[in-house]
Amino acid sequence: MNKLITVAIDGPAGAGKSTIAKIIGEKFNLMYINTGSMYRAVTLKALENNISAEEVDKLLVMIDGMDMHFENDELILNGENINSLITMPNISKNVSAYASIREVRERLVNLMRKMALKYSVIMDGRDIGTVVLKDANFKFFLTASPEERADRRYKELMGKGVEVNYDEILQDIIKRDYLDSNREVDPLRKAEDAIEIDTTGIGIMGVVEKISSYMEK
């Protein structure tokens, strides 16, 4: 690939975006950028520093002091791999509050776009195809039922040894769907030119094959 390639994958929480984006990234030699993990990193640091979502000025100063980049598909914050920390339930419950702040989104979107100017990238999130990479070469919107997404998250966390309750995860996903879809700034929605894929019951590799078939045309 001589010219830079950009791929946008959007969808609600637990639709399989990050797993699928990683595989597609490896297959097509694209840098995988998990934008959700960047918002989770902000949430992690805000909670550690007792900065509420209402304290926007403090949040922006905090973000300006955060050095974020990706190594082997994992987020490195100020020299530390924080991937195990940002997938904890407490972060999942609070991330929507911080991610809905206009100034926070502007800061992080600017950083994401700079990455896409340097490398061929695949990004997943809520507003990649509609906001971050409006001119992406390929746009996909992944969906799945709330129950299926809760089951995936439950198994993922239990597999990591985290004791969680399925019903709590399901309610959290339903709540996050509502917040993400109804927030004032850059709500979750499918880009008009995105290809929608329902991942319910298909399996990861089935979705990868579908996306690959579009990209190889």
UniProtKB/Swiss-Prot annotation:
GO BP term, example: nucleobase-containing small molecule interconversion
GO MF entries: ATP binding; CMP kinase activity; dCMP kinase activity
SUPFAM superfamilies: P-loop containing nucleoside triphosphate hydrolases
Gene Ontology CC terms: cytosol
EC number(s) given by UniProt: 2.7.4.25
Binding site for ATP: 11-19
EC category: transferase
Predominant subcellular localization, coarse grouping: cytoplasm
Subcellular location field: Cytoplasm
One Pfam family recorded for the sequence: Cytidylate_kin
Entry keywords, A to Z: ATP-binding, Cytoplasm, Kinase, Nucleotide-binding, Transferase
Catalysed reactions, as listed in the record: CMP + ATP = CDP + ADP; dCMP + ATP = dCDP + ADP
HAMAP family in the cross-refs: Cytidyl_kinase_type1
Membership in a protein family: Belongs to the cytidylate kinase family. Type 1 subfamily.
Name of the protein in its database record: Cytidylate kinase
Gene: cmk
